[in-house]
Amino acid sequence: MSEEIDRSNYSADNIQVLEGLEAVRKRPAMYIGDIGTKGLHHLVYEVVDNSIDEALAGHCDLISVWINEDNSITVRDNGRGIPTAIHTKEKRSALEVVMTVLHAGGKFDKDTYKVSGGLHGVGVSCVNALSGDLRATVYRDGKIWQQEYKIGKPQYDVKVIGDTTEHGTEVQFKPDTTIFEATVYNYDILAARMRELAFLNKGITVVLTDLRTTDDDGKNPSDTFHSERGLSEFCEYLDRNREKLIPDVIYFEGENDGIPVEVALTYNTSYTENIQAYVNNINTHEGGTHLSGFRRGLTNTLKKYAADSGMLAKEKIEIDGDDFREGLTAVVSVKVQEPQFEGQTKTKLGNREVTAPVSQGVSTMLSNYLEEHPAEAKIIVDKVILAARARHAARKAREMVQRKNVMSGSGLPGKLADCSEKDPALCEVYFVEGDSAGGTAKQGRDRHFQAIMPLRGKILNVEKAMIHKIFENEEIKNIYTALGVRIGTEEDSKALNLEKLRYHKVIIMCDADVDGSHIETLILTFFFRFMKELIELGYIYIATPPLYLVKKGQKSEYAWNDDQRDKYIQEMKGSGLESSVGIQRYKGLGEMNATQLWETTMDPEARTLRQVTIDNAAEADQIFSMLMGDEVPPRREFIEKNAKYAKIDV
């Protein structure tokens, strides 16, 4: 995939310097996305990307990542080691140049790395600038070299601290707490990315270990990610909770017009498509030219096969591209020397030269498979025909959703208690479980900017429903209407149209019990599958009602978890007995009166809202399919590990 380079040829003079570091600390979000959870974890990805580049060049097969007890991070690889010799132009060690100058590194020298990862491509120097402390250790040329930095500034010249027979680079850093709003690393977020990298770069091993905690046996949580079959295994992982339509993962790897292309795809019995597209290991959430090439290759090849085999002869309906992608799970990975990223979040590939190579690769792979597997080919085409029929039914149902908006005067559902403010940026709507809790919420809200929409019972599980059934569902029609969301734009008849979106905060408020969690998940599944843009824009939130009211005499406190409850019990009992303290466990929102609901859950000054974000699209997709699909054991295991109510009400 990348040119082989002798270890000796990766030298100080391969390091190219493009610009200085000053701006990073002033405007960190420009370089790493944000200064919250996403940016914090992005620092780790930048360092790991350096090691992945070494792996792509054929010089590294083991990357180890530790979350240390103090929330610092250590990344170690067995690559060639960053060069330490004096840089000809800079007149200082190449290691210091790489660590202190933005965009300095071998990845900008095409002879050193043919392709390199990293969305922002800012390299490890950016991590250095945003770290309170960083230590770089290089094992190279029989010596151990080291340099330490504070907020990006070297504390001493690069020095030799010992001899070694090993080779590689180790970077330990602690993010600067004066810059980052979030400072605690989430093991699961890092694990999802390390797993993804192992699938995308087959043959390498990535080990993640959390030194902050131990299990019952006294061992630190640790995962080893390694994949011999790469994207084929990735597809199987994404689909592991879905029922297979065909037994195989169809796989292609090759180089067309100098662009390495790797594709894996399979079909399941669900009604959703799940295509994960990557460029240089970056998940391009907004798609781009490689995704267009994939879709074109898939549609044209399947259409031709279906027509040539006579399977479409009796069908009176037109088949379109979407029909070929219902139930499809695919991973597309391309390596591009100079990627051009576009779109809102800079995750849309713009290189036009990528479309044809991907399209050709998919066509060749799929044509061969269909010819060699006629039974599976027939199953796929039969599903396509069913999808086309369902799409025609869904179009009529979608038109009914639109008509409901237009025909019903204000276009708002009768159950919606709207707010008086008309600026969507200042308005919020609560989707509340049940009419009785909805009544309490209506009494407790601030009518100026808070709207209440009660939902009756459990909404439809969209993961298992055919698309026309979804748009015929009354509660789902009401959600579209209440939000002012329409379907169809000038460019795309099925795209989400947010021009008349009425609220910039959509808050899901359910009971604090197992049923409430289930309803919350059903609503989130709907948003993830049909209104993902609202999640990506940061508009979806989950309310956090208290679990307990702890009371003694005139004194009362709300508790949101068991630790808080126990703390208040100890404070209130004083020298008395615990039984002297009254504890009310709130199982439903209806158990609180309007004032209590306002004070704890709806008052912007006092409430806690959890914003719903998608850190890893591939991981989110498989979690939703697992939670809302048919397989019970993985769902039970996930809930026991993650749900705060699992042990209370089961």
PLM ranges: what are they?
Residues M1-N14, L21, Y45, D53-A55, ...:
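GHKL-family ATPase ATP-binding module
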Residues K26-Y45:
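Conserved short strand/loop->alpha-helix "switch" segment adjacent to the catalytic nucleotide/phosphoryl-transfer site
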Residues G81-I86:
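A short glycine-centered beta->alpha linker in the GHKL/HATPase_c
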Residues H87-T88, L95:
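Short adenine-binding "F-helix/F-box" segment of the Bergerat
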Residues T88-K89, R445:
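Short Gly/aromatic-enriched secondary-structure transition segments
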Residues R389-S408, D423-E428, G439, Q443-R445, ...:
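C-terminal interaction appendages of subunits in large macromolecular complexes
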